Amino acid sequence: MPDFKIVISDPQSVEPKRIKVKVKASDQVKSITGEKDGKAVPQAKVNEKTKQLLNVDTLLTLEITKQEGDKKVKVKGHFKVDVDNSVPDNEVWISKTMAEKFGAEDFEAFAYRTKTLQISVDQNKATNLVGLKIGDVFEANQLIGLPVKLKITGGSDNSGFPMRFDVIGAAKRKILLSGPPGFYPNENGERRRKTIRGNTISQEIVQINTIIVR
């Protein structure tokens, strides 16, 4: 049974403020099983002043550019923010496990409010999602450790067929479409018969798109 890939978007993070910060691996930040593999949201500690400067609510992104051979590669990590006023201004503490992802335990990075992140969840641990529909809201804390509510906006199955909000049920169907999701017309009035999924999450769904609701 494949994992659910839950895509989380923050609708209030439109043009996030980017600030250069110092990042340190700290024993004060515990590693979480699965954080390096995208199966858990790692923790980052910042002080209240830095949190407000970044206009961060719950999630923070750190980004660096690394030289790999003749190419420059961006490395990003998304973190759940924990306020700790013992952390100096413009500094972020992360776990040693996440520091390995960036290739250093002491480095500079751009920090900003997270726009989108993806996390993989074992379907056996997320059985409460099966049967939910597009538009439903669920608590993310118990499932992925984030103290937020998530609203389901869509998704797709393991063949890439998208869920449609206006088709009842979980079954795969072939219907006539005039617009997305499932079909993007090139001309006004163009319609095509396409395969889609209904609006209900089943075990065949592999990606669930959500937004944070407040």
Curated annotation (Swiss-Prot):
SMART domains linked: Ribosomal_S6e
Protein's UniProt keywords contain Ribosomal protein: yes
GO cellular component, one term: ribonucleoprotein complex
Alphabetical keyword list: Ribonucleoprotein, Ribosomal protein
Domain of life of the source: Archaea
PANTHER family referenced in this protein's UniProt entry, alphabetically: 40S RIBOSOMAL PROTEIN S6
Family membership: Belongs to the eukaryotic ribosomal protein eS6 family.
Name of the protein this chain belongs to: Small ribosomal subunit protein eS6
Organism name: Saccharolobus solfataricus (strain ATCC 35092 / DSM 1617 / JCM 11322 / P2)
Name of the gene this protein is made from: rps6e
